[in-house]
Amino acid sequence: MSLIIVFFFFSLLLTSNGQFFDESKNYEGSSDLVDLQYHLGPVISSPVTSLYIIWYGRWNPTHQSIIRDFLYSVSAPAPAQYPSVSNWWKTVRLYRDQTGSNITDTLVLSGEFHDSTYSHGSHLTRFSVQSVIRTALTSKLPLNAVNGLYLVLTSDDVEMQEFCRAICGFHYFTFPSVVGATVPYAWVGNSERQCPEMCAYPFAQPKPFPGSGFVAREKMKPPNGEVGIDGMISVIAHELAEVSSNPMLNGWYGGEDATAPTEIADLCLGVYGSGGGGGYMGSVYKDRWRNVYNVKGVKGRKYLIQWVWDLNRNRCFGPNAMN
């Protein structure tokens, strides 16, 4: 349900062809350790899913373009060169509901609302996010209870309950008493000012604790040159995968507690390539400017997004996998 903060300390070797190789072998997960189950609830399976963005706070148009292009890349009419964001989404789509319907193939950006006046202040809670959605719905956006998905993105000066201490993002569903219907939504914040070392890792490094023996490594260069935004992209991908496979908290997850589930992206937290796991990010790419990425998007964009659990392979997987 939430992207929980975990530090990952990477140990990588750079090969002559510009690709990273982890010192470890295959640690992409083990089916023996995973208790992922289907709990008979829905997945987001509409043939076309309408995505609505709520930009909360003051946003740089360049930052918005990077995020929009990622969302366009999920189901672009002309997918980017392999490995692409749309290839990554194919792994998410493996999950079905009890009718046999897979997760949606087409995610369409259908509307945006800019809440630049901070209508509910600069300090939000998990519950007040629903009021933010209500404000957007009464101002501009439609209430789409049929095939709508709402994405609340907060600027780097907005504080969120548990942000930087326990979470980088979360998903849930709205209450009819607040919004007027039950619709799935996700929240992700820009951590650049508050905790980039936690929610934008590996583009920012945690400060070593005195006496810990930990030596900070060279920071990875973000593929779009924006530490906070490039960090947000992976969290957005994480939450999109999980809200799609577990929108009402009774779909796909592991564990006994539906209010604190281990979902399909949680199982692969910190894994971005082959060999990843146990604190290693895995094999990823570097471009000519030494920016790190593992998938390509529309308009020549590149992104670094974490893998998700592959239902068929019984391990974490992404399109940049070496095997």
Curated annotation (Swiss-Prot):
Keyword Glycoprotein included in the entry's annotation: yes
Glycosylation sites noted in the Swiss-Prot or TrEMBL record: 102
InterPro entries: EXORDIUM-like
Keywords, in A-Z order: Apoplast, Glycoprotein, Secreted, Signal
Cellular component terms (Gene Ontology): apoplast
UniProt keyword Signal present: yes
Major localisation: secreted
A Pfam family annotated for this UniProt entry: Phi_1
UniProt subcellular location: Secreted; Secreted, Extracellular space; Secreted, Extracellular space, Apoplast
Signal peptide: 1-18
Main function: May play a role in a brassinosteroid-dependent regulation of growth and development.
Protein family according to the UniProt entry: Belongs to the EXORDIUM family.
PANTHER family in alphabetical order: PROTEIN EXORDIUM-LIKE 5, PROTEIN EXORDIUM-LIKE 7
Protein name per its UniProtKB record: Protein EXORDIUM-like 7
Organism: Arabidopsis thaliana (Mouse-ear cress)
Gene: EXL7
